Curated annotation (Swiss-Prot):
Residues 50-96 are annotated as: Disordered. This is Large ribosomal subunit protein uL4. Keywords: Ribonucleoprotein, Ribosomal protein, RNA-binding, rRNA-binding. One of its GO terms (molecular function) is structural constituent of ribosome. Pfam families: Ribosomal_L4 (PF00573). It comes from the Bacteria. One of the primary rRNA binding proteins, this protein initially binds near the 5'-end of the 23S rRNA. It is important during the early stages of 50S assembly. It makes multiple contacts with different domains of the 23S rRNA in the assembled 50S subunit and ribosome. One of its GO terms (cellular component) is ribosome. The lineage of its organism: Bacteria, Pseudomonadati, Thermodesulfobacteriota, Syntrophobacteria, Syntrophobacterales. It comes from Syntrophobacter fumaroxidans (strain DSM 10017 / MPOB). GO terms for biological process: translation.
Length: 207
């Protein structure tokens, strides 16, 4: 069973915490992470882009000139794709990018990502994370103290002071445990958790 040091906001070790093997000791299978990241990115796509083909472009119903006798190349419509103002050949059309991945696989991928963060020592656990006021400088000072950059902060409960203090700091994102996902875990170098957050994550994913 892996253990981690628990810090206060001054970076003093105040204890240790045993982590669940079912959540923080899951062997890495890169292809599972890859599939789930593709699934998440695909769900973000609207799939509404559309170009007009020759049958969609307005006009072009009349033959531009007679078939023979003008010396010009034959033409049946002024909306041919080779004409200026004509339709587009093989342009993008509306499509559904949806992928289906079982919920068990998505949960497994989150556990793998958390386990890898622990192995890479990119997981920082605080006893608690509470700000006295909405102050970006105060929260930035905590991150600097732990030498954290591009950080994902996962909280167990809504915290307006923390969320508003963090939103103007570049490369810092605050998520509730309900929104914890593989893409954000992999896209951020460091993950900042609290003791309460870990308890909630283990309760959700450990079953």
């Amino acid at each position: 069973m892996p253990t981690v040091d628990i810090f206060n906001t001054n970076r003093d070790v105040v204890g240790q915490l045993e982590l669940s093997d079912a959540v923080f000791a899951v062997p890495l299978r890169p292809h599972v992470l890859h599939e789930v990241v593709l699934y998440q990115l695909a769900k973000r796509r609207a799939g509404t882009v559309k170009t007009k083909g020759r049958s969609d472009v307005a006009g072009g119903g009349k033959k531009p000139w007679r078939q023979k006798g003008t010396g010009r190349a034959r033409a049946g419509t002024s909306r041919s794709p080779i004409w200026r103002g004509g339709g587009t050949i093989h342009g993008p059309q509306p499509r559904d990018y949806e992928m289906r991945i079982p919920k068990k696989v998505r949960r497994l991928a989150v556990k793998m990502a958390l386990s890898q963060k622990l192995i890479d020592r990119e997981l920082t656990v605080l006893d608690q994370l509470q700000l006295e006021q909405i102050k970006t400088r105060d929260f930035a000072a905590i991150l600097d103290r732990f030498e954290l950059s591009k950080t994902l902060v996962v909280i167990a409960q809504p915290d307006e002071k923390l969320q508003k203090s963090a939103r103007n700091i570049p490369n810092v994102k605050v998520l509730r445990t309900e929104g914890l996902n593989v893409y954000d875990l992999l896209n951020h170098r460091s993950v900042l958790l609290t003791r309460e957050t870990i308890g909630k994550i283990e309760e959700t994913l450990g079953s």
